[in-house]
Amino acid sequence: MADRPVVAVTGPDGRYPIAWGATRLAVFLAGGTAVRLTPSNFREHQKERFQAIIIGGGSDIDAELYGGENTEHSRIDLERDLFETEMIGHALDTNLPILGICRGAQLINVVLGGSLFSDIRLLREQTSNRRTPFPRKTAIAESNGVLLDAIDSDQWRINSLHYQAIDRLGEGLKVVARDLDSLVQGVESISHRWLVGVQWHPEYLIYLKRQRRIFRHLVCRAREGAAESLKLPED
């Protein structure tokens, strides 16, 4: 469809991960068209224009980027860190709608001057550290905002596939949701047109209406601001 906003979805190099397929479907169901961007292929898309961007999940963020220390469990993809940092900067400069998923939310926080917990497993007291794509954990609303407008509930079920989490909040962000251990589960910008970061993976939960609504809100904002599209920088 000609009126489908084009949404850039960042991810790692290599084979197509399951997360990309799930995110692509979520964007399609929301009325948009997803285009996969990686550190090695983004030059192929430099002539395209995007109306929104999703910073996807995946490997851990290099702790050196926020003054922390990596652990023995850290899986670092520095090339991706640097590529997505640049993409976030351009999206912020052009006021493009941004959704950060899991590591994407964490990286947005780091780009804005915040820090992360490198390993949250010792911080959990109320919930387990079991990683699962199924909605086995609970997020609780902390403040109103665009995420709560999308979720339309003060409590909802989430999945958990992470060891890192937001610690010190980045400039211009506010916390809008936490889990039962008070770890940050949702952030958004207090000034950007539409910037939301979620610590869970809504792309794996699109069989739940509340999770689909996150992508629908992103695509709606992209369509409203289609004139403010992002063209990737030339070399």
PLM features per residue range, with description:
Residues A105:
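The feature captures the ABC ATPase H-loop/switch
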